[in-house]
Amino acid sequence: MLHSAWLNSHYQTGLKNLLDTAVLEGTDEESARSLASRWQKIDEIPFDFERRRMSVVVAENTEHHQLVCKGALQEILNVCSQVRHNGKIVPLDDIMLRKIKRVTDTLNRQGLRVVAVATKYLPAREGDYQRADESDLILEGYIAFLDPPKETTAPALKALKASGITVKILTGDSELVAAKVCHEVGLDAG
């Protein structure tokens, strides 16, 4: 699963965010060299804020392409029909969705941002890949990142409050992550 995340982060052409940097730097150099030499980029479906995911299409051989999709958990789950669980591919049914939600909610309550990774093997073809190809994916797993607030955040918020300025939070993060961060910096998450 981490290799799939690395391929996605390595081969995307957009700006790499802190999560991509963490994935790239968290992979040992030997594995990174091996992945880069074995897999070639074929195409890319760029990130956009509507889909909240992005995909790269890579090939290890001339017969098959692999679409590697990475993004916000719910948006990835929406395009998955199966999940890799204990080394086997099983249907992504309600029971499995509840298990995933239980685990990821626990991670979010700890302030960890969760990014999901899914894949799909396709016969090799010519031409561009489209958003429609991001369907019937296999959820490979998810990676969790801690992105703590800067040490200066809480004092800055106190100073704003003392000056009579009300601070509102607008975030694309999970509600649970936002609540944890608000608690850490002394804001009411309500």
Question: For each predicted feature, which ranges?
Answer:
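Cytosolic catalytic regions of ATP/NTP-dependent phosphoryl-transfer enzymes
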Residues: 1-139, 145, 158-159, 167-187
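Glycine-rich, often acidic-flanked micro-motifs
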Residues: 163
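The conserved cystathionine-beta-synthase
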Residues: 149-159
